[in-house]
A protein has these predicted regions:
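Topogenic membrane-insertion module of multi-pass membrane proteins
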Residues: 1-57, 61, 155
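Small-residue-rich segments of transmembrane alpha-helices in multi-pass membrane proteins
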Residues: 27-33, 158-172, 234, 300-319
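Membrane-embedded alpha-helical segments that form the functional core of polytopic membrane enzymes
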Residues: 31, 44-75, 132-143, 190-214
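Acidic (Asp/Glu-rich) catalytic motifs at the cytosolic membrane interface
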Residues: 64-89, 210-232
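Multi-pass membrane catalytic core of lipid/isoprenoid biosynthesis enzymes
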Residues: 85-126, 228-263, 306-313
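Intramembrane alpha-helical segments
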Residues: 93-182
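Functional transmembrane core segments of multi-pass inner-membrane proteins
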Residues: 160-220, 238
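Extended hydrophobic alpha-helices typical of membrane-associated regions
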Residues: 260-325
Length: 327
């Protein structure tokens, strides 16, 4: 079916609106947090004491919040006039194309926000009342990113925090809090977070930020005209390409913490990700300028965007396999 012939508010329209390719960025941090918790709990207590309930809830919460963020971005970019079809270089968007009506998108934003809250509420049982604060902050920043913060060049920092530190560390935290080992001393304090977990979360955030850098690199001329001062706009083209390359290198270098904690494969396997990352960087570097061919530029950049999403998934799988393979 031609995308221009999609029936409004149809199942296919909503599927496109969820932006399935972005979901790897939501899943990978949680999967890494789960793998870290499973590894530590198995070695300290035994695999039978790992609780899958909070793990599944964290994964569902991440998926719903990512879809919620995509809906919010779709709606507000349309409302602010930032999705002009003639200027747009990226994939087409639901509201702008009329695939989803504005009223339906508003309802979808409200519904996914409620679903995220419902999915997240049981985590209070495992992680305590502080999980309420975590959930509220996640929801608030979903709205603030599109409406304000992305225009201030804070997008990359938010990705590091909300696609790295928060999901990895919080997932690890709530799973470890769920351990009910029968012989624990009353004054026992579980490892709610370790340096391995924190550095792994930073590495994950850097990898996911590569996706945002490619997206903003593609759109930098339009963003500059719209007054959207992303980090790419501030750095310029050459330094942005250097930033993209550095994100992958630093993320893999941080993986030395896995080796130091007895998980050599979790350090070695991400080399596969790094090879793919460098290949994507070479494509960015060799792309024809936008001024020469708008169509060729858009095609190359969107291809790089798809590769960046794939690379995130490859990185996550390499780390997860590396953490679990020795158990």
């Amino acid at each position: 079916m031609n995308k221009n012939q999609i029936k409004q508010n149809s199942l296919k329209a909503w599927l496109l609106a969820t932006r399935p390719k972005t979901l790897s960025g939501a899943a990978v941090p949680v999967l890494i947090g789960i793998a870290l918790a499973y590894s530590d709990i198995s070695s300290e207590f035994g695999a039978e004491y790992f609780n899958w309930v909070p793990a599944v809830l964290c994964l569902l919460f991440a998926f719903v919040m990512q879809i919620n963020a995509n809906f919010i971005n779709d709606f507000f970019d349309y409302a602010n006039g930032n999705d002009d079809t003639e200027r747009r270089l990226g994939p087409l968007r639901a509201c702008t194309q009329g695939w989803v009506s504005v009223d339906a998108m508003k309802r979808a934003i409200a519904l996914t926000t409620v679903i995220a809250c419902v999915v997240g509420l049981p985590l209070i049982w495992f992680g305590g009342l502080e999980m309420i604060l975590v959930g509220v902050v996640c929801v608030v920043f979903c709205f603030l990113y599109t409406t304000h913060l992305s225009y201030m060049g804070l997008g990359d920092l938010l990705v590091l925090v909300f696609f790295g530190i928060v999901p990895v560390c919080i997932t690890y935290y709530v799973i470890y809090c769920s351990v009910r080992y029968p012989y624990l001393a009353e004054d026992y304090v579980p490892h709610y977070c370790t340096w391995q977990v924190f550095l792994a979360s930073v590495a994950c955030g850097l990898v996911v930020d590569g996706l945002l850098v490619v997206n903003n690199y593609r759109d930098r001329e339009n963003d500059r005209e719209d007054g959207k001062l992303t980090l790419v706009v501030r750095l310029g083209a050459r330094n942005s390409r250097r930033l993209f390359l550095a994100l992958g290198i630093v993320a893999c270098a941080l993986g030395v913490v896995f080796w130091m904690n007895g998980h050599l494969l979790a350090f070695v396997l991400p080399v596969l990700f790094l090879v793919l990352h460098v290949y994507t960087w070479l494509k960015l570097k060799g792309a024809r300028p936008l001024s020469e061919s708008r169509a060729a530029w858009a095609a190359t950049m969107n291809n790089c965007l798809g590769e960046a999403a794939r690379n995130i998934l490859v990185y996550g799988l390499c780390v997860v396999i590396g953490l679990l393979i020795l158990l």
